[in-house]
Amino acid sequence: MRGETGVSIKNPRPSRPFSCFWRKGDVENIRKSDIGNEKKIDAKFNRLQYNLYYKPLSHHKAGLLYKELFFRSCFSYTTCSLDFQGKRHQVERKAVDIVL
């Protein structure tokens, strides 16, 4: 999708991976006070809205979140969970693949 950054997140059942996408403007800059605190953004999966939760683990390159390059480094320092089919799934960092 043009103008959007996608994150491919593996479902707890590896045979059924799924992807969610969000607009860059939906993601806020990470501040030092955000480190270790959970943040939430809306994600789209198959044109349906879901909540994507992520927890910043580092202040690395804070303030550059809107630049595509930072999406790579941001999520390498991030844990995520996703509300999917009414259940909340934890997502390992290594399962997050930034698609630019």
Swiss-Prot record:
* A GO biological process held by the record: positive regulation of translation
Instruction: Give the quaternary structure.
Output: May interact with ribosomes.
Identify this protein by name.
Uncharacterized protein YPR096C
Which organism does this sequence originate in?
A: Saccharomyces cerevisiae (strain ATCC 204508 / S288c) (Baker's yeast)
Q: Top-down, what is the taxonomic lineage of the species of origin?
A: Eukaryota, Fungi, Dikarya, Ascomycota, Saccharomycotina
